[in-house]
Design a protein with these regions (language model features):
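Intrinsically disordered, low-complexity terminal regions
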Residues: 1-244
């Protein structure tokens, strides 16, 4: 149980860290003026992306470092796009409380990405397949992520009520959910899956060889395919369910 509590704490901390500036403190309150503009920015290369805020982020294939923001003219200047340790961080400036009246869309070019993280209620969708030896995606909060991937090993983590939709191919899928989030990956074919669920979350995947699961609570794993081996430990009403 300690591992699950630690997982939940880590994601709560992640979500808090990227959104805290909008919750407390002497924040500057800004409401969108409704006038839509487009701004282009450039950065150095990155191999990871972290999003903090209620943005709609679209990933497209291209040379890294080209970012396009489409949104309200008085809101866009409050969005930071910076590189730190090889990670592109997109978030609102500190001490700002932003209320948009129009959709805020950030388009990011990618070529080789190893990690994606979202904190809050935003959305990330990839229009290109993400290819990596070792890929990870993390979601803290109620946001949504949709990705197409081709990776040897894929790590997926959710803390909260968000959803992650995956399609593509991976050899080894490792999942961890703390809360009511869902990993929807029937369109992702994996040789093996190792999943830990603490709460009422769910994992859906297509598995060829092996399923290993640790379930605490009412969370369940739904699978398609014909895995040769299924190992499960459960405390609560959670279960592994075939959906062929």
């Amino acid at each position: 149980m300690t591992k699950k509590i630690l997982l939940a704490s880590l994601f709560i901390a992640f979500s808090f860290s990227v959104n805290a500036q909008s919750w407390w403190g002497n924040n500057k309150k800004v409401k969108g003026n409704g006038t839509i503009i487009i701004e282009k920015r450039t950065t150095s290369n990155y191999d990871a992306i972290t999003i903090g805020g209620s943005f709609d982020v679209v990933l497209i294939k291209g040379t890294e470092g080209n970012i396009t923001l489409k949104g309200e003219e008085n809101i866009i200047p409050l969005i930071e796009t910076e590189i730190s340790g090889g990670t592109l961080k997109i978030k609102y400036k500190k001490n700002t409380n932003v209320k948009t009246t129009r959709r805020m869309v950030v388009t990011v070019t990618v070529s080789e990405i190893e990690s994606i993280a979202l904190g809050g209620s935003g959305n990330i969708i990839s229009k290109t397949e993400l290819i990596s030896d070792d890929f990870s995606v993390s979601l803290g909060g109620s946001g949504n992520i949709e990705l197409g991937i081709n990776a040897d090993e894929t790590n997926v983590n959710i803390g909260g009520s968000g959803n992650i939709d995956l399609k593509g191919i991976t050899n080894n899928l490792k999942c961890a959910i703390a809360g009511s989030g869902s990993i929807r990956a029937y369109n992702l074919t994996t040789s093996e899956i190792n999943a830990t669920i603490a709460g009422s979350g769910s994992v859906k995947a297509t598995v060829k060889n092996k399923i290993k699961a640790n379930l605490i609570g009412s969370g369940s794993i739904y699978y398609k395919g014909n895995p040769k081996q299924i190992d499960s430990k459960s405390i609560g009403s959670g279960s592994i369910i075939e959906k062929n």
